[in-house]
Amino acid sequence: MKYTEFEIISKYFKRNQKKDVNEIKGIGDDSALIKIPKNNILAISTDTLVEGTHFLKNISPEDLGYKTVAVNLSDLAAMGAEPKWTTLSITMPESNNIWLKKFSSSFFKILNKYNVRLIGGDTNRGSLSITLSMYGLLKKQIALLRSNANIGDLIYVTGTLGESAAGLFLLKKNIFIKNVNIRNYLIKKHLNPIPRVSEGMALRKIANAAIDLSDGLIADLDHILNDSQCGANINLNKIPISKVLIDNFQSQNYLNWALNVGEDYELCFTISKKNIDKLKIIKKKFLVNFTCIGYITPIEQGFNLFDNQKKIIFKKKGFNHFD
């Protein structure tokens, strides 16, 4: 049995989620109505995921439902915003009830984990693509902007880098690894990234600039440098690489994955040296590591990578939709 557009919305996407006090009208009308609390501003992020470009054709509906939400949460995390609401638009070749049930179940599972409510959306027929808009709140004057880095700031990243790219290459069979547990771990890092929402909210009062690492460290950090009109010195030996990658792959592979491939969805942020003691206190609250990889310099000095004090020549590349 195939459902109509409105039957799909009613059956799979109209859930009895915990209501938000600022939500006047949610899903089910021509538009949602939201009240913005006093002294707050609204952070808005939108991502479109297209089959064959952002996810492989054989991805499970459960993994796609999770990742659709996770990558948008990561954008809000980079601003220091608290995620509150979302809208979803799905274009798909046909009304597949089994697919919709699995997708929506995973989709709402991660929404509920982060206390986010679905307040609207749309369904259409066509090649599989998903567009999600995420809305979050934060107090005025404390957003983590890409343009706020200052000369002398230290540059930090959360977690480890390169594992998502390794998982992608395993899925595409560009590399092979015998250990099934390690293989599954890396693939999960690609399909089920952890958005650093709590970390972003904790950093918003002490960090200066931030970005989530979706396109690779070099490309994403370069956005901060361009917007802040600064340069940077990065030490390759300080980039956090997991023992899993070091033990199972060559260094040129995992460094390239960390620098250029992306989809780690960790946070890269800059912070003044005077706030390092505050950062140490924050670090104790989280299981994830915070690693200093370099510092911000005057724009005239450019963007530099060093390997044991030896300057490395590199190209500023990363994921680009139109390459």
From Swiss-Prot:
One of its GO terms (molecular function) is magnesium ion binding. Its EC number is 2.7.4.16. Mg(2+) 5 binds at residue 215. The keyword Protein biosynthesis does not apply. Keywords: ATP-binding, Kinase, Magnesium, Metal-binding, Nucleotide-binding, Thiamine biosynthesis, Transferase. It comes from the Bacteria. Mg(2+) 2 binds at residues 47, 75. ATP binds at residues 121-122, 146, 214. Substrate binds at residues 54, 263, 319. Coiled coil: none annotated. GO terms for biological process: thiamine biosynthetic process; thiamine diphosphate biosynthetic process. Pathway: Cofactor biosynthesis; thiamine diphosphate biosynthesis; thiamine diphosphate from thiamine phosphate: step 1/1. Mg(2+) 1 binds at residues 46-47, 122. It catalyses: thiamine phosphate + ATP = thiamine diphosphate + ADP. Mg(2+) 3 binds at residues 30, 75, 212. Mg(2+) 4 binds at residues 30, 45, 75. Disulfide bonds: none annotated. Reaction mechanism of ThiL seems to utilize a direct, inline transfer of the gamma-phosphate of ATP to TMP rather than a phosphorylated enzyme intermediate. PANTHER family: THIAMINE-MONOPHOSPHATE KINASE (PTHR30270:SF0). Belongs to the thiamine-monophosphate kinase family. Catalyzes the ATP-dependent phosphorylation of thiamine-monophosphate (TMP) to form thiamine-pyrophosphate (TPP), the active form of vitamin B1. This is Thiamine-monophosphate kinase. It comes from Buchnera aphidicola subsp. Acyrthosiphon pisum (strain APS).
